[in-house]
Amino acid sequence: MRTLTIRTQRPYNALIAPGLLDRAGQEIARVLSPCRAVLVTDDTVDALYGDKVLESLHRAGFDAAKFTFPHGEESKNMQTYQQLLDFLCACDLTRKDILIALGGGVTGDLCGFAAATYLRGVRYAQLPTTLLAMLNSSVAGKTAVDLPGRKNACGAFWQPSLVLCDTAALDTLPEREISNGLAECIKHAVIADAEMLPLTRLPVADYVELAARNVAVKERFVSQDERDTTQRQFLNFGHTAGHAIEALSGYQLRHGECVAIGMVLAARIAQGLGICAPDVPAAIIQSLNAARLPIRC
């Protein structure tokens, strides 16, 4: 198992290993004493892991309930957020209690935003089940929901208390979702750690090291600039055009696919302005092609 400390104002650990969901309750109880807990997940992930994680929480002494919502970016809105808040009130959750996000980036963003705002802030844990969430959003501290026509327009910075990355969960993902996550890996390689690129060609079963290297890159930027005002903005590489493409596609294109296209556009613009080496766009395209990611709309 790999353990990385995320050095923010409230430091926490990210644990990376196969099988963590089986003992999620035990690992969470090491950091957050058993209390009332609400597990937040979408209907797809719930069918795979919801009951298993809920039972693990019960075994560890948590008084746990589960909130499930329809999967997809379309659910990351104020309506679902309000439904979650209503559920927390119905459970009589207090500031001594916790939320747990089980799923991909949508779940992490929604649960994290609820944790940041309910009773002016409660603790929460991230249990990412997609490669994209493991490499990116689960350790970012950025939480948000979408507003009409605006992605992540209503949100807050709120760090989790623990992140559990169970790499065995990646075995259930279709190839497209693996490629979706590799886009963020390629982004991290371009901006900070080119030596990790060969890791993107490893079998999914060997992704513990890949996840650890990416979390380390993310931690480096977040620890220097938790509020995203200076250095952390390097992590937005590919996202300026990427978010626009994602919205214009009606979210039919995955986030990583849109970031991939955005990176190509940004690199070509930089090449045209003479602020990057001439071979950079071609190198990025080669890596994206190897990861089966789009390079144009």
Model regions and ranges:
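Glycine-rich beta-strand-to-loop/alpha-helix junction loops that act as flexible
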Residues: 71-72, 102-104, 237-238
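Short glycine/serine/threonine-rich phosphate/pyrophosphate-binding segments
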Residues: 106-113, 134-135, 244
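A glycine/threonine-rich phosphate-anchoring loop and its flanking beta-alpha core
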Residues: 15, 113-202
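Solvent-exposed alpha-helices and their adjacent loops that cap or buttress functional pockets
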Residues: 31-32, 92-94, 117-119, 146-147, ...
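Active-site segments that bind and position negatively charged phosphate/pyrophosphate groups
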Residues: 198-297
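Non-catalytic interfacial helical region
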Residues: 85-99, 111-126
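ATP/NTP phosphate-donor binding region
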Residues: 1-98
